[in-house]
Structure formats: structure tokens, C-alpha cells
Amino acid sequence: NDYYDVNLKNNRLKILQQYDKFTFQKQNLEDKEEIDRIFKKNSPNRVIHLAAQAGVRYSIEHPEVYIQSNIVGTFNILEGCRHNKVEHLVYASTSSAYGLNTKYPFSVHDNVSHPVSLYGATKISTELMAHSYSHLYGIPTTGLRFFTVYGPWGRPDMAMFIFVKKI
């Protein structure tokens, strides 16, 4: 999509392609048949699922993108894990899950039933789906609630990137 310049992702990819065991396949997570094919072809023991449509502001104007990528896409990953006997799934969530909580610091035990963005709601949904798959199908899962991720390859819409660029 047009969320930000695709060249940033392509430049990140060039760094990873230097590693012999790294492979890259560009696929839409919501394409269940293609995700199934990738799981069958590669037979992974462990899956690290970091793909998602990120960003709170973009979710206000493009909610369908978040439902498809985050919820449907994660469902397809979970199904791939279930049908291919994956030993462990690590997936990305977000600090947006904490929504209207006012207690600081946040805790994994805090209530997350009041998201204030569709983005946060989709990521909470993926956490609940992963928890259900763990319980129903015995797939160990670990969710990571990332806060603001920054660095030289950070997303250009993030405050830190904007501030540094203006200096």
C-alpha cells in the first residue's frame, strides 16, 4: 500500500539478503492458499510472525486494510501453524493494546478490553486468537507488545524519525 515509501522496505531487505539461510517471499497474508503452500513447502518448526499493517492514524481512514492484514492474515498464519505442527509461534502485538489504561507502568495483566483505535483492536484480536490456538491446538505462542520502535530504519511516520529529520 501507499502507507510509506516501499524503498525503505527494499533497502532493509537488501541487508537481510546477505545471509545465506535467509529467503524472502513477497505474499499477502490474507491469501490463505499461498500461505498454506509456503507452510507445506518450508515445514517450519518455529514461526516468527512480525508482519502486520501498523499505525494508528492510517487505521482511521483505511480500516479494511487492518482487518485483512492483521486479523485475516494472522488467522492464516495460525492455521498454517496448526496444520503443520509448528512447535512455537512468536508474534508481534503493540502497546496500543493498553488503550485507555491509566496505570503506569503497563503490565501484561492490565485490562485490554478498551482499545482507542482500530489498529489496537485488531492487535488485541490477534492476541486472543493466538491464545485460543494455544489452548485448543497446543501451539505454544509468545506475543510481544512493542512500544515505539525506532532506529535508522524506522518508519518515517513515527515522531522520532520526524524530529530527527527536521534537525
Segments (PLM) and residue ranges:
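N-terminal Rossmann-like NAD(P)+-binding domain of SDR-like oxidoreductases, especially those catalyzing
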Residues: 1-149
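Short alpha-helix within the catalytic core of nucleotide-sugar-dependent glycosyltransferases
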Residues: 78, 160-161
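Alpha-helical substrate-binding/gating segment
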Residues: 135, 161-167
